[in-house]
C-alpha cells in the first residue's frame, strides 16, 4: 500500500491528533472537530454556519456537537440579551484539542433546544 502525500506549503493546519485516536468519538465527530479546529481562532461558530459548509443536515451536525460536548471537546455557553452588545441571544463555543472537563459553574447546553 502507498500513501501519496503533498508538500505542505499553504492551505494546511497543524493540530493534535489526540481526538483522531479517541475511540469514544465517532468518525463524524472527529471530522467535525477537525474541521472546527482548522478554522481561524476568531471564527464565529454557529450550527447554521457549520451546516452551510457541510453535506450533513442540522440533526447530524447537532448529534456530532452533542458527542463533542459529552466527551469534553466542546462547551457552548448561552448568553442572554442582557449580556450581549447585540441585545440578542448569542452562543459562545469553547473548542478543545484535548478533552476538557466541564467546570461546575458552567452550564453546558443541550443542543436539542438550540435553533
Annotated model-derived regions:
Residues 19-31, 36-93:
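Winged helix-turn-helix DNA-binding recognition segment
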Residues 9-23:
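Short, Lys/Arg-enriched N-terminal segment that forms or immediately precedes the first helix
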Residues 94-115:
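Charged low-complexity intrinsically disordered patches
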Amino acid at each position: 500500500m502507498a500513501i501519496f502525500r503533498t508538500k505542505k506549503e499553504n492551505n494546511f493546519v497543524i493540530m493534535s491528533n489526540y481526538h483522531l485516536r479517541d475511540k469514544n468519538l465517532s468518525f463524524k465527530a472527529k471530522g467535525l472537530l477537525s474541521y472546527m479546529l482548522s478554522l481561524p481562532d476568531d471564527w464565529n461558530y454557529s450550527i447554521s454556519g457549520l451546516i452551510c459548509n457541510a453535506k450533513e443536515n442540522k440533526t447530524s451536525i447537532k448529534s456530532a456537537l452533542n458527542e463533542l460536548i459529552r466527551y469534553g471537546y466542546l462547551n457552548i455557553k448561552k448568553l442572554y440579551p442582557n449580556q450581549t452588545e447585540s441585545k440578542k441571544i448569542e452562543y459562545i463555543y469553547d473548542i478543545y484539542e484535548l478533552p476538557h472537563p466541564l467546570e461546575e459553574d458552567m452550564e453546558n447546553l443541550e443542543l436539542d433546544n438550540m435553533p
